[in-house]
Swiss-Prot record:
Keywords: Iron, Metal-binding, Oxidoreductase. GO terms for molecular function: metal ion binding; superoxide dismutase activity. Belongs to the iron/manganese superoxide dismutase family. NCBIfam families: PRK10543.1. It comes from Photobacterium leiognathi. The lineage of its organism: Bacteria, Pseudomonadati, Pseudomonadota, Gammaproteobacteria, Vibrionales. The keyword Cytoplasm does not apply. Homodimer. It holds the Pfam family Sod_Fe_N. Destroys superoxide anion radicals which are normally produced within the cells and which are toxic to biological systems. Disulfide bonds: none annotated. It catalyses: 2 superoxide + 2 H(+) = H2O2 + O2. PANTHER family: SUPEROXIDE DISMUTASE, SUPEROXIDE DISMUTASE [FE] 2, CHLOROPLASTIC. This is Superoxide dismutase [Fe].
Length: 193
């Protein structure tokens, strides 16, 4: 059975940008519910023996939605860290500059893409098979690992449960908080993978 992975930080570690109350609901209830539902759907089937990634790449409907949301949320938590944010360095900085011209330009494009990503959704920075970087929007449980050769580097959760307690309907303010928490070390590990 799949388990809810431990958060890589304490429940209050992302304050004031993301509150403990948000994490209690977002991680403790929403993320956990996806895990519980996925286990209920795959129990007693051949999918129970597969990895989360295999299930995401080969399933549809409720199984896909719950598996992808488990994966997406775990990835998102790792994209965040207390006392993080700022600008990337090294290979990540170089790759972003090559793709977008500058970090400021990338940040503006990613933020604009996230703010205008309609409904329950995710915005991603991905590395394509040819090594180029791109900003990709997915709807609902959409997950870039379903695309051959695409490696997710960074994501922001744009479902309302990610920000409504702290920011109400102000997605741009949530994005300001997101940039203060980006874990560039995790992005760097993904880029090197």
């Amino acid at each position: 059975a799949f388990e809810l992975p431990a958060l890589p930080f304490a429940m209050n570690a992302l304050e004031p940008h993301i509150s403990q109350e948000t994490l209690e609901y977002h991680y403790g209830k929403h993320h956990n519910t996806y895990v519980v539902k996925l286990n209920g759907l795959v129990e007693g089937t051949e999918l129970a023996e597969k990895s989360l990634e295999e299930i995401i790449k080969t399933s549809t409907g409720g199984v896909f939605n719950n598996a992808a949301q488990v994966w997406n949320h775990t990835f998102y938590w790792n994209c965040l860290a207390p006392n993080a944010g700022g600008e990337p360095t090294g290979e990540v900085a170089a790759a972003i500059e090559k793709a977008f011209g500058s970090f400021a330009e990338f940040k503006a494009k990613f933020t604009d893409s996230a703010i205008n990503n309609f409904g329950s959704s995710w915005t991603w920075l991905v590395k394509n098979a040819n090594g180029s970087l791109a900003i990709v929007n997915t709807s609902n449980a959409g997950c870039p690992i379903t695309e051959e050769g695409v490696t997710p580097l960074l994501t922001v959760d744009l479902w309302e449960h990610a920000y409504y307690i702290d920011y109400r309907n102000l997605r741009p303010s949530y994005m300001d908080g997101f940039w203060a928490l980006v874990n560039w070390d995790f992005v760097s590990k993904n880029l090197a993978a």
